[in-house]
From Swiss-Prot:
One protein family per Pfam: Med20
A GO biological process held by the record: regulation of transcription by RNA polymerase II
Name of the protein described by the UniProt record: Mediator of RNA polymerase II transcription subunit 20
Role according to the record: Component of the Mediator complex, a coactivator involved in the regulated transcription of nearly all RNA polymerase II-dependent genes. Mediator functions as a bridge to convey information from gene-specific regulatory proteins to the basal RNA polymerase II transcription machinery. Mediator is recruited to promoters by direct interactions with regulatory proteins and serves as a scaffold for the assembly of a functional preinitiation complex with RNA polymerase II and the general transcription factors.
Gene: mdt-20
Species assigned in the record: Caenorhabditis elegans
Quaternary structure, from the entry: Component of the Mediator complex.
Amino acid sequence: MGVTWVFEAEQTAKSVERLLESIGGDLHGTFIVDVTPFNPPTPSSDYPSNVVMHHSKCPQSTFSICPKDTFKKSPKAVCDRGFDLILSKLSSGLIADNAGKIEIIGNEYSLYKDWMIRVGTATQGTTVKGVVVEIEYDPSIIVIQCKDMMIEFVKSVFNKYHETLPEIFKITEKPESYTALDTMWQYLGIATKLRKKT
């Protein structure tokens, strides 16, 4: 997994896919991301919610984040796939908010061997909430090495969205390795925003 940039697109998934095909993108497969909040039985500031996420790029992993203001302040973990099964047994402490679950399902495109672009439709239950695009630059996992290249790519392909940088691009000044948790934090932010849409 390389450095990734996730954003909500204003176009339909089909129009983004046509755009990718027009610049040489090859359909590589499909992908799915799910974001499920687990909340305490009674809302309390002492006991925050926990969000459990999965990404088909990491099929054996479950990502768990207790969201705070920033990524650095948020308790987070990467667990074995069975972690969400354990949470379901802790219903006295955390209850799955299945009505708040967001699923993003779509297609993966490879472009020039270095880029993987995932375009998916986000749904909450039976309601379509939006289109999400994930751009992954595979040659490096060092954020500051990829940042400018990714900004130029987004700018040249989409002609927008390049001004809304992911938090990881803004806070990273030293050569730090990018991890899958950084990607899931971006998905969490988008899912939170999409949940509020009517």
